[in-house]
Amino acid sequence: RGRSGFIVEFNNKYRYDLLQQVSLNQEDGISIYSKADFVFYPKNCKLKPIVVFTDGFAYHEKRVDNDSAQRMVIIKSGKFIVWSITWEDVNEFDKSKPNYLFENFLIQQEVNLKVTEKYFAEYKKYIDKTNFELLLEILKVDNYGDFEKFSLGIIAGYLKAPMELNNFIDLIPNSIK
């Protein structure tokens, strides 16, 4: 890739080139310049590179709009997966769960939990993981299909609109029921 970095390997199977402070711009199909903290470039050409941002509240609190625009452009390019982690995610890894000062939207409630349990039960194992733990999980897959379905489960959990459970279930595509 024309610069020094690291080679990361999991289970003697999943290999990545890991680069730090990577500029993403027009040459990468990104219309708004962005500098990622890390990018994992998979050796498996069927997978997309994973762009990682490490978000500290002190720096990012005043630029949420810019950060969101930059990341949305990267996502919409279709060439990358975007991932955000915090210092708490990394610092508390393998110790105890971070003590976040905000609501963890991965924790489903009432009707949302029922939908998640019924249609996304195999992904329930991910609900209590931090973003850093989830990043490590996605780095150990051959395709992103399971994580796409898991993401749909998370989206289902965000729904707050009053609707009957059966009406919502009817909206779920048959391909993932």
PLM features: residue spans?
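Nucleic-acid endo/exonuclease domains
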Residues: 1-177
